[in-house]
């Protein structure tokens, strides 16, 4: 997934997209907190233990597998989006229409960004894994970090990392604090309805509230001056921008242009589905067919024509992640990546147990 600061910024930019229905744009403008919640909703499970994850990140350790995040990104992601919109519209409680629509706009911005930028993130991460070794998830996170850094510098002239503004960005519910894992009751109910509609089960409310609080801890950490110094250091590195953002092979903004088109399409489809108030199986099926939401982690597995519509990227050599970019039958990496395959199988088994 793109970096959290990019997801949050892109979610907040829904209000400025001229092609999106005015009611949805207004909702995202009026309810920035719930827009940000929707924009980061898919990734919240990754923040279950912020201190441990920060240590792992600093040590360059592989990212932890998180079954709930894997489900939302790769196990019927289109059904989860349909369930999320239905829950936003129907969950009882004192939620205003704009609050409900802001959740929808934020979530669809996340989907649009993943579907259009993840192919580029995956390419860069696998390129660097091939060239430098190490675990792909480490290179994946670095790629996301530099994409977000140079995007913010190009678009806004400043990086939000290391600034007090980012503490506010990381507030994604209206209750709770850095200390208390507390979320307003209607949002907890909405969360559980969204998960259950797609998967039949949901995280415990206290667990999910802990993820929300932990995300605020993340916001506090990356708003500190030490994060600003690191950002300034990376901005002065002449090798990073041409490697990750713009070179003879790709331009980040060519992919980002697709993100803006996709978010307009998805937000209008999502608004129509929300506004119609029909959440029957037939209506959900119609929304899913129109939205064409692919695997968010590996776009193109379900709708290869949408992947083909993105700017082209070179095919990596056969020494790459199995089953992703390598031609079928070419398996010189087999022994090297056997452990990776076993990890994937264990992760899939955990997801099945959750189901």
Regions found by a protein language model. Give the residues of each.
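N-terminal leader/auxiliary helical segments
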Residues: 1-106, 111-355
């Amino acid at each position: 997934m793109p970096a959290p600061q990019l997801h949050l910024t892109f979610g907040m930019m829904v209000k400025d997209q001229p092609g999106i229905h005015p009611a949805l744009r207004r909702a995202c403008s009026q309810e920035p907190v719930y827009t940000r919640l929707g924009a980061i909703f898919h990734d919240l499970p990754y923040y279950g233990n912020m201190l441990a994850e920060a240590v792992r990140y600093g040590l360059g350790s592989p990212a932890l597998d998180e079954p709930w995040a894997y489900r939302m990104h790769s196990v019927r992601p289109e059904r989860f989006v349909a369930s999320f919109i239905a829950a936003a519209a129907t969950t009882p409680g004192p939620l205003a229409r704009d609050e409900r629509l802001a959740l929808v706009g934020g979530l669809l911005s996340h989907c649009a960004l993943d579907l259009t930028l993840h192919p580029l993130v995956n390419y860069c991460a696998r390129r660097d894994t091939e060239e430098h070794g190490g675990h792909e998830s480490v290179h994946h996170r670095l790629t996301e970090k530099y994409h977000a850094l140079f995007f913010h510098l190009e678009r806004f002239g400043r990086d939000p990392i290391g600034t007090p503004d980012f503490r506010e960005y990381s507030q994604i519910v209206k209750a709770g604090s850095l200390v208390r894992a507390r979320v307003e009751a209607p949002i907890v109910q909405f969360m559980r309805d969204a998960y259950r509609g797609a998967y039949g089960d949901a995280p415990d409310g206290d667990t999910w509230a802990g993820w929300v609080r932990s995300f605020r801890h993340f916001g506090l950490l990356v708003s500190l001056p030490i994060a600003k110094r690191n950002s300034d250091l990376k901005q002065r590195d002449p090798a990073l921008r041409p490697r990750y953002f713009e070179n003879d092979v790709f331009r980040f903004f060519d992919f980002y242009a697709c993100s803006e088109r996709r978010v307009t399409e998805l937000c209008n489809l999502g608004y129509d589905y929300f506004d119609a108030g029909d959440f029957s199986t037939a209506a959900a099926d119609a929304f899913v067919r129109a939205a064409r939401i692919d695997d968010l982690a590996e776009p193109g597995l379900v709708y290869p024509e949408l992947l083909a519509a993105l700017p082209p990227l070179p095919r990596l050599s056969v020494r790459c992640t199995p089953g992703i970019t390598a031609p079928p039958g070419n398996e010189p990496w087999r022994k090297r990546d056997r452990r990776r395959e076993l990890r994937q199988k264990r992760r899939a088994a955990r997801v099945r147990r959750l189901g």
